[in-house]
Amino acid sequence: MKRNIFKTILLSACILQGGSALAQQEKAEPGKFSPTWESLSQYEVPEWFRNAKFGIWAHWGPQCQPEAGDWYGRGMYEEGGAAYKWHLEHYGHPSEFGFKDVINEWKAEKWNPERLVALFKKTGARYFFAMGNHHDNMDLWDSKYQSWNSVNMGPKRNVLGEWEKAARKNKLPFGVSIHSSHAWTWYETAQGADKKGPYAGISYDARVVTKEDGKGKWWEGYDPQELYVQNHALSGHAWVAWDWPEGTSVPPQSYYDNFFDRTVDMINKYHPDLVYFDDSVLPFWPINDTGLKVVSHYYNQNMKLHKGNLNAVVFGKKLEAKHKEAIVWDVEKGVPSECQDKAWQTCSCLGTWHYNRSAYEDNWYKSAETVIHMLIDIVSKNGNLLLSVPMKGNGTIDDKEEKILEDIAAWMEVNGEGIFDTRPWCIYGEGPSTETAIPLDGAGFNEGKNAPYTSADIRFVKKGKYLY
């Protein structure tokens, strides 16, 4: 224990000493947009996105390897929780086998991105999303500013690069989701230790393990603190600290700069058509303007690539009216009760965001019928649906997911003309489901709270002179 305490103090000193030394490296693209809400309000949603209506998302990374569901990299450090118990049984104690070691288990040995993207297109997707990084802070490309990336370790493949190539081959707009701003608070459970049992008081790996500890191990030469970023004070009130600054431990400037550099590096290399931020409004808003800087760079670069036309789409959550002038509102696992004036998107998934074997074994995937009903309702309200199809760590989807996609494809083949390229009518619908408004809960999360649809529920859209 004394050794762990000493190492923690030493690491904290190092992080404070070096925090201001790493200034922002990437340069922002100059142009029409500057990093203010007033400037970004010049944005107009491109018509291609309004026409697309349906996208599919490969929300896939190292947390899919255990096949134990969402937020595994956080939950494995929560004593007594489901992920913690699963981890003990399959990997060992998190003081000895941390999330860094789960990354080494992820090999993606059966991953065929071309086959999957072609399948998603056949299902009816008009755009495709890949995950660039999650809250676990591992970059899934040849990142210049995060050595814990998928080229250096895990599958040792440029995951984002291969997804991008497959999307371009299938002529699908390519999107990337970025979630890493929250690593600062998300990993805070890893600062702890068991309170009881044989490992009581022994620190989990994230707070105490050093680069020097890797000598002779698979991660030799890599600093776990670059992954975990946990040499800081704990946030004030647990996971209430999702929104900045709601009790959060505030990061230093070096953390913002690293986020900017990593995200701009990704944009400059892969030129995504869409970028999704898993953040309330934008990364670090309102305590820092890094998110605004990334968006203005992205818009300016996209205009440069498209001869003055802005074809890009950026998503954020929990947006106020002024924010909706600048970026597109994303609603997680939910749908607003009324038609929206501006284009928006629901993101949802067949099961859990990260692959969960129990969803397969216990048959609790959304059915094709459920997905189609969601899509029809969303499109009638001027929205798009981004559907995540959970993938195993080995890079495949299971047979039940394949069947759901096959059924969606069959429906789209007959009914797609009433979905794609449509616009809202003067009313979005009628029937029992329109009579009760189900309020959104924060970023969304009203999915499944409405009564089941019946044959009396009708939705309307228009295309040219035709009403559907």
Question: Where do the protein language model's features map onto the residues?
Answer:
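Mature catalytic domains of secreted/periplasmic carbohydrate-active enzymes
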Residues: 24-468
